[in-house]
A protein has these predicted regions:
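Bacterial N-terminal signal peptides that target proteins for export
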Residues: 1-10
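A Zn2+-metalloprotease active-site environment signal
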Residues: 7-8, 15-16, 23-241
């Protein structure tokens, strides 16, 4: 190993603590979160991403539906572990069965998902799950993992002098960052159940929602196979649903 290569790597690693915004215990999860962005930084990132999402996907042009989903979301947000944040809930004009959050505190639901749900309680369970991602700070943690994965790729390339190693590390980084991961999804499920119950809705609705997703997933896999493409599955390759 080239000893001179160690110096920039050590400098790279030494800079990491300077970027950490906090590792305090999260009241929603009872765990310590190591993240590289403060809540204010996350809000700014989410605002910027919202403009891109609206441009790329478009909002459903039915204000009554938008208002209804926002009102339901606010009910759940008020009983979450972060009730003082400014939440916004949007319906995306997309036929796919999906819902997602980019962080504090925007939640997006596809119109295609809404038409497949059968009750208000099922909609609440979806919104509660996404709010669970926010209160557990999963988006911020995923962003931090992405930064660390990129730094790891740079370090591997410097230490070995091999671009091939860096490329392999990048493949690992992509798999690591994509999706929230099974543990995070289960954590969001647990928080979503808790918030649904606090808001006065039957927690059993989440199980029915899972069944809707599973049926939609089977249909999407069959259609994708016929169309010769990859299926578009809710929450990515590491989904627990």
């Amino acid at each position: 190993m080239n000893r001179s290569a160690i110096v920039p790597v050590l400098a790279l690693l030494a800079s990491l603590p300077l970027g950490l915004a906090g590792c305090a215990t999260n009241p929603a999860t009872g765990k310590s979160n190591v993240v590289m962005s403060s809540m204010s930084g996350e809000r700014e990132r989410v605002r910027s991403m919202h403009e891109e999402i609206v441009r790329a996907l478009g909002l459903y042009e039915d204000q009554a539906i938008q208002d209804y989903i926002n009102e339901l979301g606010q009910r759940v947000a008020r009983v979450s572990h972060l009730p003082g944040e400014e939440y916004r809930f949007y319906v995306i004009d997309d036929p796919g069965m999906n819902a997602f959050t980019t962080g504090c505190c925007n939640v997006y639901v596809n119109r295609g998902l809404l038409v497949n749900l059968n009750s208000e309680a099922e909609i609440i369970s979806v919104l509660g799950h996404e709010i669970g991602h926010i209160t557990a700070r999963h988006p911020a943690r995923r962003q931090t993992r992405g930064v660390l994965a990129s730094l790891g790729t740079v370090a591997a390339t410097i230490l070995t002098g091999s671009n091939a190693v860096g490329q392999l590390a990048n493949l690992g980084a992509a798999a690591w960052v994509q999706g929230y991961g099974r543990d995070n999804e289960m954590e969001a499920d647990r928080l979503g159940l808790e918030y649904s119950a606090r808001a006065g809705y039957e927690p059993e609705a989440m199980q029915r929602t899972f069944e809707v997703f599973k049926a939609g997933e089977r249909f999407e896999r069959d259609r994708a196979r016929l169309e010769g493409r990859e299926p578009r599955i809710y929450h990515g390759i590491f989904s627990s649903h």
